[in-house]
């Protein structure tokens, strides 16, 4: 899908660049595969703000996406491609030969009328799902499981993908978009292809209101606040904050490493922080 640019007839349209979604289905989603979403506004169950700068936004309904792909050896046909307000990728409505409907993440080069299938030994073509142990080395994949049967967790947002670069003692070696190389069990399922909507990274909202439509409120800098609100606040005139960057709660930020899950370090063969050679 292409990008749409606009003539600058208003200030908000001067910089506006959006994805052309004219080829997507224009109707409503399949009702049995949707559920109502209530607005949280960044609040928890006690009503206190736990995530700042969230609130408002257009009403949404949640689409149930099949991330597990465990309907094995049943062929499904792509009925239509749809927009999903809850994610950056597009989704595809699949009708299986037994009549069941399901939504899956739409990969690039998947078109209406194409057939997809999940199984232990299926063709390597976009939209098909299979265990990593059944894939040829070098395959571009998305929606990759970290634990067999848990459902895809890696490479699910627009334009992303991972690559199967090798195998080792029942484990698959993946190269992720970040540059990280990681071991995953060969029994984990993954889907073939890269995720749809690769132009998502090139859009320009053109005005603050488009972020508000998505439920994102203005992100206020700490140095623009008062001392009561932030460690960087206060000072006469504009200041640089006067200390190394910290969160509103005084903890170091901007580059401070926060990873604490040492149990899975053994699965990371090459860190995403290593210098690119």
From Swiss-Prot:
- CC per GO annotation: large ribosomal subunit
UniProt entry keywords in alphabetical sequence: Ribonucleoprotein, Ribosomal protein, RNA-binding, rRNA-binding
- Superkingdom of origin organism: Bacteria
Segments carrying the region annotation (Disordered) are: 222-277
Which GO biological process entries does UniProt record here? Answer: cytoplasmic translation
Tell me, what does this protein do in biology? One of the primary rRNA binding proteins. Required for association of the 30S and 50S subunits to form the 70S ribosome, for tRNA binding and peptide bond formation. It has been suggested to have peptidyltransferase activity; this is somewhat controversial. Makes several contacts with the 16S rRNA in the 70S ribosome.
Q: Which PANTHER family match?
A: LARGE RIBOSOMAL SUBUNIT PROTEIN UL2M (PTHR13691:SF5), RIBOSOMAL PROTEIN L2 (PTHR13691)
Q: What is this protein called?
A: Large ribosomal subunit protein uL2
What is the organism field in this record?
Brucella canis (strain ATCC 23365 / NCTC 10854 / RM-666)
Question: Gene encoding this chain?
Answer: rplB
């Amino acid at each position: 899908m292409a990008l749409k640019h606009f003539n600058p007839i208003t200030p908000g349209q001067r910089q506006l660049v959006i994805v052309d979604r004219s080829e997507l289905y224009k109707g409503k989603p399949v009702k049995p595969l949707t559920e109502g979403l209530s607005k949280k506004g960044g609040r928890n169950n006690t009503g206190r703000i736990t995530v700042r700068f969230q609130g408002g936004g257009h009403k949404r309904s949640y689409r149930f996406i099949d991330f597990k792909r465990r309907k094995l050896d049943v062929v499904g046909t792509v009925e239509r491609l749809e927009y999903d307000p809850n994610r950056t990728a597009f989704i595809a409505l699949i009708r299986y030969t037994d009549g069941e409907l399901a939504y899956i993440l739409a990969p690039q080069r998947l078109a209406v009328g194409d057939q997809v299938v999940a199984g232990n030994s299926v063709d390597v073509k976009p939209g098909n799902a299979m265990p990593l142990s059944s894939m040829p080395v070098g395959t571009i994949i998305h929606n990759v499981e970290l634990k067999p049967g848990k459902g895809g967790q890696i490479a699910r947002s627009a334009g992303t993908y991972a690559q199967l670069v090798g195998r080792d003692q029942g484990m698959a070696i993946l190269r992720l978009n970040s540059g990280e190389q990681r071991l995953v069990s060969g029994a984990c399922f993954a889907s073939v292809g890269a995720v749809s909507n690769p132009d998502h990274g090139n859009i320009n909202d053109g005005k603050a209101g488009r972020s508000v439509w998505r439920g994102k409120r203005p992100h206020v800098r700490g140095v623009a606040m008062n001392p009561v609100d932030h460690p960087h606040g206060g000072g006469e005139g504009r200041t640089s904050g006067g200390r190394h960057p910290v969160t509103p709660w005084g903890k170091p930020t901007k580059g401070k490493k926060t990873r604490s899950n040492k149990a899975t370090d053994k699965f990371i063969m090459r860190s995403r922080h290593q210098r690119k050679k």
